[in-house]
Structure formats: C-alpha cells, structure tokens
Amino acid sequence: MSSLREIILDTETTGLDPRQGHRIVEIGAIEMVNKVLTGRNFHFYINPERDMPFDAYRIHGISGEFLKDKPLFHTIADDFLEFISDSKLIIHNAPFDIKFLNHELSLLKRAEIKLLELSNAIDTLVMARSMFPGSKYNLDALCKRFKVDNSGRQLHGALKDAALLAEVYVELTGGRQSAFKMVDKSVETNNLATNQVNNKTEQATIVIKPTKEELQKHKEFLSSILKTA
C-alpha cells in the first residue's frame, strides 16, 4: 500500500498582509503519514527584519526582542521546502499562510524555487464550514467540538496550533478510530529536527482501533508540544 504523506502547517506573522510589509515570524509543520503522526516536525522562529506591532504581539506573544537572534527566512528556506516536498499541506485558512509563504519565497529571488500552489492545500476552515454550517470555525471552537484538549493554548503558536489542527483534521476526516498510532520515539522540536528523525514512513501504519497505550502516546506528543512551543 502506498503511503499518504501530509504536512499539518501553521505560521505566525507580524500582521495580516505581506503587501504592507508584514513577515512570517514562526513556522510549525508536523508530518502525518496515512493519518498517523510520526513525531517528525519542522519548527523555526524567524527574524522578520522589522518591528513587531503590538496587535500581533497580543495574539502570539512573540516579541521583536526575542526574534533578534533568530535565523532569517532565507537561511531556513531550503530545509523548509525539503520538509514539505510534494506533500499535501493541511492548513486552517490556507490562503493566509500560503500568501505569506509565497511572499517570503519570492523575496529570495531564486528562479529555481517554485511558489506554493493553493490547490495543493487542504483548508480545514473550508471543510468545517461545509460540515457545520452556521457554527464557529476557529481552531478553539473546533477543538471544543471534537473534545480536543487545548488548555495549553493561551496564545497562538505555529507548532502547537499545528499539533491541535492535526487532531481536528483527523476528526474532520473520520475520527480517532481510523488513526493516531504514534511512532515510539521522542518528539524533536529543535531546529535540527528535520535531520535527526528517521524518515522511514513504513514505520507508520493505520490503526482501526487505537489501544489505550497508543492514545496515551498521542496525548504525550501533543502535551510535549504545548509545553515547549
């Protein structure tokens, strides 16, 4: 059986529109194979080379001072593109993240880099609107609907929000009964994660009915991200 690799992705930014000079300050992406989290992820804070507006700071709590010594986007771009490769992207409100990522990629002025296609993204916001018309569709509301524990989400954060979205996405596409066998390895959330984790996707297999131990491993995976991201 061929493997289905999907990347659950989120970003944090300095504002709402890259055309007004706003930039990405955090990228969080989590690998899922056959609807199973592998424990492999990509996470960076990024120096936006500009100030942090207070309105944005109130949302994610990332200060300009904190970002001063963080890498510039161009230094992590190749690793990011390698991590997502040709996989389907799972994003909540995909047009927002795609436009910011493409803006950052366009600033590199490298002819060999192709911009991301919105058609290659699955938008969980669109899915939720279709499935639950008239309801609230933000991540907190969906976590509440599906009883996903988001108690550690006082502020937005790209990696922790991607972890929550992974749970929501599985619920939107069939529920926990069809997924979430966790790979038995520690979660790597540092900047070397893409090189340190074994990428043998055959380790991930679909589980029709997860055991208590498997569900506990998933909870521990999510908790570790909420505590450290």
UniProtKB/Swiss-Prot annotation:
Segments passing through the bilayer: none
PANTHER family given in the database record: DNA POLYMERASE III SUBUNIT EPSILON
Cofactor(s) named in the record: Mg(2+); Mn(2+)
Annotated binding of substrate, by residue: D10, E12, D55, H60, D161
SUPFAM superfamilies, alphabetized: Ribonuclease H-like
CDD domains on file: DNA_pol_III_epsilon_Ecoli_like
Cofactor note: Binds 2 divalent metal cations. Magnesium or manganese.
Reaction it catalyzes: DNA(n) + a 2'-deoxyribonucleoside 5'-triphosphate = DNA(n+1) + diphosphate
Biological process, per Gene Ontology: DNA replication proofreading
UniProt EC number: 2.7.7.7
Binding annotation for a divalent metal cation 2: D10
The gene coding this protein: dnaQ
Known partners and oligomeric status: DNA polymerase III contains a core (composed of alpha, epsilon and theta chains) that associates with a tau subunit. This core dimerizes to form the POLIII' complex. PolIII' associates with the gamma complex (composed of gamma, delta, delta', psi and chi chains) and with the beta chain to form the complete DNA polymerase III complex.
Residue sites binding a divalent metal cation 1 per the record: D10, E12, D161
Pfam families: RNase_T (PF00929)
Stated role: DNA polymerase III is a complex, multichain enzyme responsible for most of the replicative synthesis in bacteria. The epsilon subunit contain the editing function and is a proofreading 3'-5' exonuclease.
Keywords recorded for this protein, A-Z: DNA replication, DNA-directed DNA polymerase, Exonuclease, Hydrolase, Magnesium, Manganese, Metal-binding, Nuclease, Nucleotidyltransferase, Transferase
Active site residues per record: H156 (proton acceptor)
Organism: Rickettsia felis (strain ATCC VR-1525 / URRWXCal2) (Rickettsia azadi)
Protein name: DNA polymerase III subunit epsilon
GO CC terms in record: cytosol
GO MF: 3'-5' exonuclease activity; DNA binding; DNA-directed DNA polymerase activity; metal ion binding
Biological classification of the source: Bacteria, Pseudomonadati, Pseudomonadota, Alphaproteobacteria, Rickettsiales
